[in-house]
A protein has these predicted regions:
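Bacterial N-terminal signal peptides that target proteins for export
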Residues: 1-11
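Bacterial N-terminal signal peptides
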Residues: 9-21
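Boundary at the C-terminal end of the N-terminal hydrophobic targeting segment
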Residues: 23-27, 33
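Aromatic- and carboxylate-lined catalytic core of secreted/periplasmic carbohydrate-active enzymes
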Residues: 31, 54, 294-298, 305-308, ...
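Active-site mouth of glycoside hydrolases
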Residues: 34-36, 41-279
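Short hydrophobic alpha-helix segments
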Residues: 59, 463-465
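Active-site clefts of carbohydrate-active enzymes
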Residues: 251, 265-267, 286-326
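Short strand-edge motifs at loop-to-beta-strand transitions and within beta-strands
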Residues: 469-471
Length: 503
């Protein structure tokens, strides 16, 4: 392919992508009035679907303080923008972390009367319902955290500690009240945990034990009974079995390690976080969860935030800098290609809606309005588009596609394909990298190879090869990261990321 042909091909691909994006945006607007179907676990146990059987790719955004820290106009701007940027779900909190009980919201509302979980303030919960409905109008689901974890673990967190093992009915009452207010909304799923472990008992984690000890908890502390009551209250309030996840503290302790067999837990969650350095091997944690029985979907609910300072605890060294868009892409692509049912993006200024009124923590470097247009935040839609442009429910992780060592840390490559061997994706985090792929893992006499740019969402055809052989590839000299897309030519798939396959 000469340079003129390749240039024409790239222009054509970009034009089609632009038109397709406009169609998707218009579709979201025209269907906004329709109730969104609920989400459930797909029959394979690893992925998600809507109640009417359509694929659901979890592309989340952390908006933890949306209910507490935004005006109506700000919330509308946030929801509209994230809807237009291709997100499918936002994560927010009812009883939020930072003074969410004692400080009135941006609308002047407190969630509880006299700090009593048995006395919810109806006006505050009216606002919760409004946000859920406005999210639906923008094509968004809401992953609702009823209770941030510090309301169980304070003074590990600002608290106050409202829910204890000796007042379990309070947790069930509060969850029931909230769920009953939302029982007619299909666009709500539930997240328990709120950045805290469900227990200290049996956790071989010195940091968690030290945090628990400093807050006055014994080493065998177990908050699981409280979360069971929350889950029970949600189910009773809804009148149906809900989709529930668990959001643990940062680190390799996925909810699978201590909650996997809980009947109320639908999806495992983990938090690779912001304090462990670059290139945390989240792909290994996803693979561990993926192999567990019975199968449950899993995902990283809080990777390194864009523009978050690198490990600011206890004191930040500015020389270490911030996590930027490249750091975010490396983590989200590799976790999804390792078998996750999706992934959550986050921006350090957006989760708390940092501005002059709300303040900020941990060296926020910009206002949340500006942060809504940061590179990685806009680029996440390309990951979703890529996944949805090929058969959705058939994808399985397969590192055997990569011949030899897949690399470690910042050089780690991650591969995924479909069960029929009609396509494969390989994420490459570095430029000028030589690597080989076993095309024998795919079916087809001829295999078409393309480079997919995760910064622009544009795919470029490289060449076509005979099937059944090993082929060496070389990543482009600019980037820095790329996705190699391999397709059975006979499948006649569209260019990667351009249109939703079979939807």
């Amino acid at each position: 392919m000469n340079w003129r042909t390749r240039l024409f091909f790239n222009i054509l691909v970009f034009f089609v992508f632009f038109l397709n994006s406009m169609v998707w945006a218009q579709s979201a607007r025209t269907t906004a009035a329709k109730p969104l179907p609920s989400i459930r676990v797909h029959a394979d146990g690893h992925l998600l679907e809507t109640a009417d059987g359509r694929p659901f790719f979890w592309l989340g955004d952390t908006a933890w303080e949306l209910i507490h820290n935004t005006t109506r106009e700000e919330a509308s701007y946030y929801l509209h923008t994230r809807g237009q940027q291709g997100y499918t779900i936002i994560q927010t909190v009812v009883l939020s972390e930072f003074d969410g009980i004692t400080k009135p919201s941006a609308l002047g509302l407190l969630p509880l009367i006299d700090n009593d979980p048995r006395k919810p303030n109806p006006a505050y919960f009216d606002r919760v319902v409004e946000i859920v409905d406005e999210a639906a109008a923008n094509g968004l689901y809401v992953a609702l955290v009823p209770i941030w974890g510090d309301k169980l673990t304070a003074p590990w967190g600002s608290g106050p500690r409202l829910f204890r093992n000796d007042n379990l009915p309070d947790a069930r009452f509060f969850a029931h009240y909230l769920a009953e207010r939302l029982k007619d909304r299909g666009n709500v799923v539930w997240i328990l945990g709120g950045d805290r472990p469900a227990r200290l008992k049996g956790m071989n984690n010195d940091y968690l034990q030290e945090m628990g000890k400093s807050a006055g908890f014994p080493p065998n502390q177990d908050w699981t009974p409280i979360w069971r009551e929350v889950a029970r209250g949600i189910e009773e309030g809804l009148g149906r079995k809900p989709l529930i996840l668990y959001h643990p503290q940062g680190g390799q302790e996925s909810s699978s390690l201590y909650l996997h067999d809980e009947p109320w837990l639908s999806v495992n969650g983990m938090q690779s976080g912001h304090g462990g350095g670059h290139d945390i091997p989240v792909w290994e944690w996803i693979a561990r969860d993926y192999a567990m029985k019975p199968a449950k979907p899993t995902l990283d609910l809080e990777p390194n935030y864009e523009d978050h300072p690198y490990n600011p605890w206890p004191d930040w060294d500015p020389a270490t800098g911030y996590f930027r868009d490249y750091d975010v892409r490396k983590q989200v692509y590799r976790s999804v290609f390792a078998g996750a049912c999706g992934v959550t993006y986050g921006h350090h200024a957006v989760w708390g809606f940092a501005n002059a009124r709300n303040g900020s923590i941990n060296h926020v470097d910009r206002d949340w309005i500006d942060a809504m247009q940061r590179p990685a935040g806009r680029q996440m839609q390309y990951l979703r588009a890529l996944v949805e442009s090929r058969p959705f429910f058939e994808r399985i992780p397969d590192q055997a596609l990569i011949v030899g060592d897949a690399g470690k840390g910042g050089q780690h490559m991650q591969a995924i394909r479909d069960r029929d061997g009609s396509y494969a994706f390989v994420y490459l985090p570095t430029i000028d990298t030589y690597f080989s792929v076993d095309l024998g893992k795919l079916k087809g006499k001829r295999i078409r190879a393309s480079w997919f740019d995760p910064r622009t969402g544009i795919g470029t055809l490289v060449d076509t090869f005979d099937g059944g052989i090993q082929v060496q590839f070389h990543t482009p000299s600019y980037g820095p990261d790329w996705v190699l897309v391999l397709d059975n030519e006979a499948a006649k798939y569209p260019p990667p990321g351009l249109s939703r396959w079979g939807m």
